Amino acid sequence: MGIHEIYIRIWTVAFVGCMVLADAASAEESARDGVIRKSGNLRVPDHDAGDVAFLMRQPWNQKNNHRKSYYPAIFIFGDSLSDVGNNNNLITTAKATRLPYGRDFPGAKPTGRFSNGLIGPDFLAEYVGLPTPPPYLSAGNNILQGVCFASASSGILNSSGNVFGEHLPLAKQVTYFANVRQALQAMLGEKGTKNLLGKSLFYFNVGSNDYVTNYFLTNGQVPSLLQTQYTPSQFEDLLLSNLVLRIEELYAMGARKMAVVGLSVLGCLPAQRLIRKGSPTTCVESINEIVRSYNIALLNRIHSLQAAHPDAVFTYLDTYRFIDSVIRQPSAYGFENVLAGCCGSGRFHGLPTCSIPGLYKVCEDASKYLFWDFVHPTSKIDKLVIAKFWTGSYPDAIPYNLRELALVP
């Protein structure tokens, strides 16, 4: 058995074991952890931290949808950063259906969102003036104002996330969108469907799992299977070629306003820092270097898509620079801990044990944390990021922020 197979089996056993333990015990149990770690030895920020008050000013209120919406519908593609419940309907260990997930969500209940509360699509929908798009697997005919296809553990490649069980890779999400388009045609006719899709927002936040649960699956000392097959540059090209292919498929089905989110600081994730034995105050720079290269190449691909399709509008949304700024200057944004998860166990709370009774600790105030668990952000940082996407300017949004994109003819 190869070493990469051993690592895959270890991860599989760990996650399946967690699910068995979770099913055998109460999901209501919680604990508190007051451990706070300060960040240090990091670069001077690129962002002006003084805008945090403005970014937090907009409240989330799904009832405030009487105003005219900026887009008629929102279609979301991605992974657990955007999954609002699709994985609830799949056989997978990648589920967020037990407390403390959702403890700060309206009603204080888990919904399948990998967060303490609301996530990106919720905040985005509020800005747009629409309800949060329903998860495709339980949407039924509720599709006129958009659908969320995002699935936890999924990636651009079909193989990414297989260690967790069933998921909807990007290719499957696009296939499901074709089903939605067909249903829309039955409701609105071809002309009505074309008009709706041409004005709707197509939002992509995908690619993290292709690295975290695939390319960077091992501890860095032994290469993963994909690392033996592809150099970082070759793997980057593989991902982007597949991503562009899916975007082209959506364009052919009528998508005309598309926003693509770059990767965040994957080298700062508690799980990666635990696996690679990172220091208490710094991130794994070798991973972040690869992420920065990917983001630059992604922006170039978006420029190429725009040149190839002048009747559509594409924009790039940068999350890396803002999160990096928060990590380097946490107090300016109201954070106290930016390198460990609020919920979990192990060093940096980098183990995926949040919601497993008896195996996790959880902080008292998630708003002081950047990370909620081993890889996912807290609701607070999601709100800040979406505010940047909505009102930000270069280099947070290139060439348009999401509000400007809506107003482009």
Regions found by a protein language model. Give the residues of each.
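Conserved active-site regions of diverse hydrolases
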Residues: 2-409
